[in-house]
UniProtKB/Swiss-Prot annotation:
Family per record: Belongs to the Crinkler effector family.
Domain notes: The CRN proteins have modular architectures that include a signal peptide, a conserved N-terminus, and highly diverse C-terminal domains. The conserved CRN N-terminus harbors a distinct LXLFLAK motif, which is followed by the conserved DWL domain. A highly conserved HVLVXXP motif marks the end of the CRN N-terminal domains and forms a junction where diverse C-terminal domains are fused. The conserved CRN N-terminus mediates the translocation into the plant host cells.
Ranges where the record places region Effector domain: 115-426
Disruption phenotype: Leads to the loss of abilities to suppress pathogen-associated molecular patterns (PAMPS)-triggered immunity (PTI) in host cells.
Motif annotated as HVLVXXP motif, chain positions: 108-114
Keyword Secreted applies: yes
Chain intervals for the UniProt region annotation (DWL domain): 59-107
Species of the source: Phytophthora capsici
Protein known as: Crinkler effector protein 4
Role played: Secreted effector that is critical to pathogenesis by suppressing plant immune responsess. Promotes Phytophthora infection by suppressing the H(2)O(2) accumulation and callose deposition. May induce cell death by regulating expression of cell death-related genes.
Length: 426
């Protein structure tokens, strides 16, 4: 699920351009509601009465001037623009697709507000009003309690709060002398004074790649630098009112992303993430921890995280077993690059079909790697997601066929039962 930033403009209203954010997996009917909520004073009709069109002509997005110059045809539709289907997802290929990237100065959605829309005191409008009010009450009482954590803004206090919310315990594991003797020594990365971490990202990517090149080639993997703004580690944690957002510095995954970078959000064949800090602080571990949690929920593979300054701190983290009904994230720290790269090579040499438990040269016991989605509770069909889907389904049907009184009442009852303060009266 990716947040899209869409620039919208109301047709025939000069200076009406505005920006909205919406999940790419949301339906267009949801986009209508978001647009109305963004403009409560200027858009007074029901959200379902809005008509949305792609602000695109000749396969090119319109700019502000182009959107302002759009004319309506005899049907009240912007000439040459494709109407968006309220029953389809925003990311449907007929709309924005999976690889949509907004550009500066572009307008993406044209909004047509019907003329002569007047409120009515009829039974129909009353029922729509009730459903809309109850929907907003539910969102305010239940859905608005979600907490959002941005990886790069993680602090010790936020990290401790996140771990507490997810009921996760972090357990350090002490390293042992390497089996088979000391690994081949490797020089520490040399940081250039006066340059930021970001300015040296290309250099340290080459450093990592040079020390694990053989295993990368043998397993068709690569070390990929994640550009700023590519928030590929953004996810809603199932079963918890927690959202994680952001990215990491480097990811080791299938080499196909070098040929086709647009596959990066899918994280094909991902093995591990690498968070680089020139100076490792107490909050750095929580940043790597939140990135690991996000990636674990996004992909099917068992993955590892590495927090490192590329000199004397190489901390590996992974989702381990469960103890006292709490998921364990284990961590072990090495102090030399030679040891760390030997561990990385061992990890990457494991096939994608290998057992989740593996032997690493720095640990006495096999590393147990598990998935958080097997250890954390999920939201039931009758709770948050089910309620939200019921409300959206009602609006989808009503936008096409008109209000359904029985369905509206059923949705209202379902919502009120889910709110503790109202469940007594339902």
């Amino acid at each position: 699920m990716v947040k899209l930033s869409l620039q919208c403009a109301v047709v025939d209203q000069a200076g009406s351009s505005f920006d909205v954010e919406i999940d790419d997996s949301a339906k267009v009917s949801k986009l209508k509601k978001v647009i109305k909520e963004e403009n409560p004073a200027t858009i007074t009709c029901d959200a379902k009465d809005l008509q949305l069109f792609l602000a695109k002509k000749d396969d090119a997005w319109l700019d502000g001037a182009g959107a302002a110059a759009v004319e309506l045809d005899e049907h009240g539709h912007p000439q040459g623009c494709v109407q968006m289907d309220p029953t389809l997802w925003v990311k449907n290929p007929k709309h924005f697709g999976d690889n949509f990237q907004p550009g500066e100065g572009q307008v993406h959605v044209l909004v047509v507000v019907p003329e002569g829309v007047v409120g009515s005191a009829s039974e129909t409008s009353k029922m729509d009003f009730v459903v809309d009010k109850v929907s907003k009450l539910y969102e305010h009482s239940v859905l608005s309690k979600r907490t959002r954590y941005v990886h790069s803004e993680m602090s010790s206090s936020k990290g401790n709060k996140l771990v507490k919310e997810l009921k996760i315990r972090v357990t350090p594991v002490d390293a042992v002398p390497f089996t088979g003797g000391s690994p081949t020594p490797v020089e520490e990365f040399e940081w250039i004074k006066g340059r930021t971490e970001e300015q040296q990202s290309g250099r340290y990517r080459d450093y990592v790649e040079a020390n694990i090149g053989d295993v990368l080639r043998n397993n068709k993997l690569c070390v990929f630098s994640v550009e700023k703004g590519a928030n590929i580690l953004s996810v809603e944690v199932p079963g918890c009112d927690v959202d994680l957002a952001g990215r990491t510095d480097m990811i080791v995954l299938s080499a196909i992303v070098q040929k086709f970078p647009h596959y990066l959000p899918h994280l094909p064949g991902v093995k591990m993430l690498i968070e680089v800090k020139r100076e490792v602080k107490s909050a750095s571990e929580f940043q790597a921890l939140s990135e690991l949690i996000a990636m674990d929920f996004i992909v099917d593979e068992s993955v590892m995280a590495l927090l490192t300054n590329l000199t004397n701190h190489w901390e590996f983290l992974w989702v381990s077993n469960k103890s006292n009904n709490r998921p364990i994230i284990a961590t072990t720290t090495l102090t030399t690059p030679g040891e760390a790269f030997e561990v990385i090579r061992t990890l990457l040499a494991q096939s994608s079909t290998a057992d989740a438990d593996i032997m690493l040269p720095c640990l006495a016991e096999p590393v147990k790697r598990r998935k958080l989605n097997q250890m954390l509770p999920f939201i039931g069909e009758a709770s948050g997601d089910g309620i939200r889907e019921s409300i959206e389904r009602y609006y989808d049907i009503a936008s096409c066929l008109g209000p359904d009184f029985d369905m509206a009442r059923a949705v209202a009852r379902q919502v009120t039962r889910s709110i503790p303060t109202l469940s007594y009266f339902s």
